[in-house]
Curated annotation (Swiss-Prot):
This is Acireductone dioxygenase 2. It comes from Physcomitrium patens. Fe(2+) binds at residues 94, 96, 100, 139. The lineage of its organism: Eukaryota, Viridiplantae, Streptophyta, Embryophyta, Bryophyta. Catalyzes 2 different reactions between oxygen and the acireductone 1,2-dihydroxy-3-keto-5-methylthiopentene (DHK-MTPene) depending upon the metal bound in the active site. Fe-containing acireductone dioxygenase (Fe-ARD) produces formate and 2-keto-4-methylthiobutyrate (KMTB), the alpha-ketoacid precursor of methionine in the methionine recycle pathway. Ni-containing acireductone dioxygenase (Ni-ARD) produces methylthiopropionate, carbon monoxide and formate, and does not lie on the methionine recycle pathway. Pathway: Amino-acid biosynthesis; L-methionine biosynthesis via salvage pathway; L-methionine from S-methyl-5-thio-alpha-D-ribose 1-phosphate: step 5/6.
Amino acid sequence: MQVQRPPLEAWYMNDSEEDQRLPHHRNPPEYVTLEKLAALGVIHWVLDADNHETDPELSIIRKDRGYNYTDVITVCPEMLPSYEAKIKSFYEEHIHMDEEIRYCLDGSGYFDVRDPEDHWIRIWVRKGDMIVLPAGCYHRFTLDEHNYIMAMRLFVGEPIWTPYNRPQDEHPVRKGYVHQFLQPELLDVDMSISA
């Protein structure tokens, strides 16, 4: 069941080295549309996180996309072993050989992805947001100032979460992503920064 609430928020980040958990809006803020995210291969749904175990919409998505394995991870200082090391590794810019699929069941955090000009776009994921980052997409994750997220991780087949830290421009999966999503002649959405 689609949940009615404000849509996913995303914006271009400033270059500040301040706490990674801050929003890092540019001044003035420069928001990014869902269409721009889709042009980068980022897919998004808003689902009923309170009823995720019986949600028919989630079942349809899982069936259609072949997500046959799930687990739930809680990221917060009290629940995640080696918390500081994990947060640091999540925030290292990296790619995966497969999609990264996360469904926020509670809490919130940020996924950052690169645009075609290598600028960071920050995506604020909140309760009910399900997001898919395509294989080969440079990205990173951090908690926001609430320091808490509970997320369902979804996989096709065996659960594999192997990050390949940047630079990976010669990796075949990265090349495939660039060819599919970042070739200027293939972009049908204006990716220019808008005020």
